[in-house]
A protein has these predicted regions:
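Tubulin/FtsZ superfamily GTPase core signature
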Residues: 1-345
């Protein structure tokens, strides 16, 4: 005869759920996206309008008129006493001093965050000058600090290009990882667009790149990427590039997606064999298999440094039909390789 188990005290499901909700909330990764200057604020606006979830969005600028046009959870007019809300005059040193004047306001939005994305267009005054200040504050607060920046179109002039390279060199010293997108390389994807439309494409790619990383952490998937996974490749990850790919060729989607991503103009002329880490994020419709996603990660591992750390995840999106999409973030890329690729464009 089996001994009857002692009856357990009854606990209502609602009480259990409340406790679980409290635990889940305490474990929730806190993420902030801070847009610096006009370009960074535009990216924040696009993310806000797209309804990106689980992210605090903050826009910072020295131009009051532009800041008024931005949708965000929070806004900071930097350097009030210095610029009077009239902008930085395209001078990075003014952008830097404005951010330093507003450090107390900026601190409120980096303190307590697990991850801070510092977003800016390099080459102008406010973004170039303030982004390193924001990144330094985020690092001081203990956050994983990821810079996401663009390098200017050549049509924007030699001075802006020179400022961009100097600003990028300064920023990379303050961030754990700095992801770089070259506007002229992005233009190769849509070569016939007028300049204003090309800037919108840049905003969209920036937004999708950040969203790809945040979704991987905050939304459940077939294979999840957790915060510690991200720390593995992005804490002290150095310079990074992003490639995006997609394919609807069933049976070859993984191969074609990765080829698309790793041969993307977004990577420029950089030798990806030097990459020391990679994050591979795969999404698809209900026909997506874990085997396909694993294949994508394997293909990336074959193209980068054999000692590189690879993390990958995959998720099903109900609005995707017969298609597979991939985002590859390559970390540990040499700074000079990116600068040379930019100068040689």
């Amino acid at each position: 005869m089996f001994q009857k188990e002692a009856e357990q005290p009854t606990v209502s499901s609602s009480a259990e759920d409340d406790e679980l909700r409290a635990l889940v909330e305490s474990l929730r990764i806190k993420i902030a996206v801070i847009g610096c200057g006009g370009g960074g604020s535009n990216t924040v606006r696009r993310m806000y309008q797209a309804g990106v979830e689980g992210v605090k969005m903050v826009a910072c600028n020295t131009d009051a008129r532009h800041l008024l046009s931005i949708q965000a959870h929070h806004k900071i007019l930097m350097g009030r006493s210095m610029t009077k809300g009239l902008g930085s005059g395209s001078l990075p040193e003014v952008g830097q001093k404005a951010a330093e004047e507003s450090e107390n306001d900026l601190w409120k939005y980096v303190d307590g965050q697990n991850i801070v994305f510092v977003v800016a267009g390099m080459g102008g005054g406010t973004g170039t000058g303030s982004a390193p200040v924001v990144a330094e504050l985020a690092k001081r607060a203990g956050a994983l600090t990821i810079g996401v920046v663009t390098l200017p179109f050549k049509a924007e002039g030699a001075v802006r290009m020179s400022n961009a390279i100097k600003g990028l060199e300064h920023l990379k010293e303050k961030c754990d990882t700095t992801i770089v997108l070259q506007n002229d390389r992005l233009l190769e994807l849509v070569p016939k667009l007028p300049l204003e439309a090309a800037f919108r494409v840049t905003d969209e790619v920036l937004m999708q790149s950040i969203k790809g990383i945040t979704d991987a952490l905050t939304k459940p998937g077939l294979i999840n990427i957790d915060f510690n996974d991200l720390l593995t490749i992005m804490r002290n990850g150095g310079m990074a590039l992003i490639g995006l790919g997609e394919s609807s060729e069933y049976g070859q989607r993984a191969e074609m997606c990765i080829e698309d991503a790793l041969s993307s103009p977004m990577l420029g002329d950089v030798d990806i064999k030097q990459a020391k880490g990679a994050l591979v994020r795969v999404i698809g419709g209900e026909d997506l298999t874990v085997t396909e996603a694993e294949k994508a990660a394997l293909l990336v591992s074959e193209r980068v440094d054999p000692r590189a750390r690879i993390i990958w995840g995959c998720a099903v999106h109900g609005d995707i039909k017969n298609e597979m999409r991939v985002m590859v973030v390559l970390t540990g890329v040499k700074f000079n390789s990116i600068v040379d690729s930019f100068k040689n464009k």
